[in-house]
């Protein structure tokens, strides 16, 4: 089983069709890995603020 996401409402599901809007769900792809992390500064600041 793969996790899927509804493109219309953004809800995550394991089914082929969304239970909320009956739209066909699509496979979720992880973000591409890059050694140059464009958003690392923001993630670290957010993590530090939560501590």
Curated annotation (Swiss-Prot):
Query: Would I find rRNA processing among this entry's keywords?
Result: yes
Q: Which UniProt keywords apply?
A: Ribonucleoprotein, Ribosome biogenesis, rRNA processing
* Source organism superkingdom: Archaea
A GO cellular component annotation in the UniProt record: ribonucleoprotein complex
Q: Which GO terms describe its biological process?
A: pseudouridine synthesis; rRNA processing
- MF terms per GO, please? snoRNA binding
A Pfam family cross-referenced in the UniProt record is Nop10p
Name the InterPro entries for this protein: H/ACA_rnp_Nop10 (IPR007264), H/ACA_rnp_Nop10_sf (IPR036756), Nop10_arc-typ (IPR023532)
Q: Report the sequence similarity comment from the record.
A: Belongs to the NOP10 family.
User: Could you tell me what this protein does?
Assistant: Involved in ribosome biogenesis; more specifically in 18S rRNA pseudouridylation and in cleavage of pre-rRNA.
**Can you say what this protein is called?**
Ribosome biogenesis protein Nop10
- Originating organism: Methanococcus maripaludis (strain C5 / ATCC BAA-1333)
Encoding gene (name): nop10
């Amino acid at each position: 089983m793969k996790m899927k996401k509804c493109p219309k409402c953004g809800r995550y599901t394991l089914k082929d069709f969304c239970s909320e809007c009956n739209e066909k769900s699509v496979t979720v792809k992880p973000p591409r890995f890059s050694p140059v992390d464009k958003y690392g500064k923001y993630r670290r600041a957010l993590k530090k603020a939560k501590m």
